[in-house]
Amino acid sequence: MKKIVVFTGAGVSADSGLATFRDSDGLWANYRIEDVCTPEALRDNRAQVVDFYNMRRREMLGKEPNAGHRAIAGLEECFDVEVITQNVDNLHERAGSSRVTHLHGELTKLRSSRDPESVSYTHLRAHE
């Protein structure tokens, strides 16, 4: 079976209604990256960082995979497909893609800095 590697970024999930980072109305229009996406931000203002990512999780849960996600998943019927994405949402998986590598992590999976075991994002609170 032939192998196909598909690379995706924010555009594929934007069609599902998820905000991108760099568009004029994107996430960086309302947040400074230094305030929510750095180790220093997590150390200095954990509550703001947790609120930012929880907002993104809530947004993601309200969105559905689009035709692009489904088309990529459909390739698995004829090919050995690996999806490599910059996206942190789970729309590829929800569309049916079985092998997805997230280059920037996943909103649905967390790892504690104190305990290497993955934890569910629903259990994370600002003081942890």
Segments and roles (model prediction):
Residues 122-128:
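Conserved small/polar residues in nucleotide/adenosyl-binding loops
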Residues 116:
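Cys/His-coordinated zinc-binding microdomains
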